[in-house]
A protein has these predicted regions:
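N-acyltransferase acceptor-side catalytic subdomain
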Residues: 1-216
Length: 216
C-alpha cells in the first residue's frame, strides 16, 4: 500500500510495470493506491486468441466504428464509471490523472467503439516495448467492449507485440483464450517481451487491418 506522502509519477508507474507491478485503488473514492503483484497472472496469448464465429461476423459487419486514441479521456472516464452489474470500480482520481499523463507521453492508449457517433465501448492500457498492459474496458452496447478487444489484438499482432497482460483472469477474458500463469513464469515472459522493438500501431492500413481481423 502506498502512503499519501509518496509522490506517484508517470515514470514510477512505468518502472513498476517493467518490474511486473501495477497500481489500483480500492474504490473510486479511495485516496490510496496499492501496488499489486499477483501470484497468478492473467495473460492473453496473442498467438492463440479465440474468436467465436458470431463475434467475428459482428466485428466484420462494421456495426461499430472503431478508433484508437481518438478520445482517451472519455474512454478512461467511462471505464471508471459505475455500470449495471459493476457498482464500483478501482479507478480513482489519481489513476485518472496518472494515466492521462501517460497518454500524453505516448504510453497509454485507448481503443474506442462508436455507434452513430456515440461512444458505446472501449478499453485502455499501457504499451511498453512488446507488451500491452490491459487496464480496463467498458460497454454500453452489445459486444462493444469485445469488438474493441478484438481490434486491439489484431493491431498488436500487426505490430508484433509479444504479450497482452490482462492482470487477472476473468470468465469474460477466458472465452478469448486468456489463461493464468505463475508469477515466476510471468516475469520471465515479461522480461523477454519488454525487449521487443514493437511500437503502438497508430494507423494501420485499413485493408491490412481487415485481413488481420478476418484471420483471428
Amino acid at each position: 500500500m502506498l502512503r499519501r506522502s509518496v509522490r506517484i509519477s508517470p515514470d514510477l508507474v512505468l518502472r513498476a510495470y517493467r518490474q511486473g507491478l501495477f497500481p489500483m485503488a480500492e474504490t473510486r473514492q479511495s485516496h490510496r493506491l496499492y501496488w499489486l503483484d499477483p501470484e497468478r497472472r492473467g495473460v492473453l496469448p496473442l498467438d492463440r486468441f479465440h474468436l467465436s464465429r458470431r463475434l467475428r461476423r459482428t466485428v466484420l459487419s462494421d456495426l461499430y466504428e472503431v478508433t484508437t486514441d481518438h478520445d482517451f479521456a472519455a474512454t478512461i472516464a467511462a471505464c471508471a464509471a459505475p455500470a449495471p452489474g459493476r457498482p464500483e470500480t478501482w479507478i480513482n482520481p489519481e489513476i485518472l490523472h496518472l494515466f492521462t499523463q501517460l497518454h500524453r507521453l505516448g504510453y497509454a492508449h485507448s481503443v474506442e467503439c462508436r455507434r452513430e457517433d456515440v461512444l458505446v465501448g472501449g478499453l485502455y492500457g499501457v504499451a511498453i516495448g512488446g507488451v500491452f498492459f490491459g487496464e480496463s474496458m467498458f460497454s454500453t452496447a452489445r459486444d462493444a467492449s469485445k469488438v474493441a478487444l478484438v481490434h486491439l489484438v489484431a493491431r498488436l499482432q500487426l505490430a508484433e507485440f509479444k504479450l497482452l497482460d490482462t492482470q487477472f483472469l476473468t470468465a469474460h477474458l477466458a472465452q478469448f483464450g486468456a489463461e493464468e500463469i505463475s508469477r515466476e513464469a510471468y516475469r520471465a515472459v515479461l522480461a523477454a517481451a519488454l525487449e521487443a522493438p514493437s511500437a503502438w500501431p497508430t494507423a494501420p492500413d485499413p485493408e491490412t487491418l481487415r485481413a488481420a481481423l478476418s484471420q483471428l
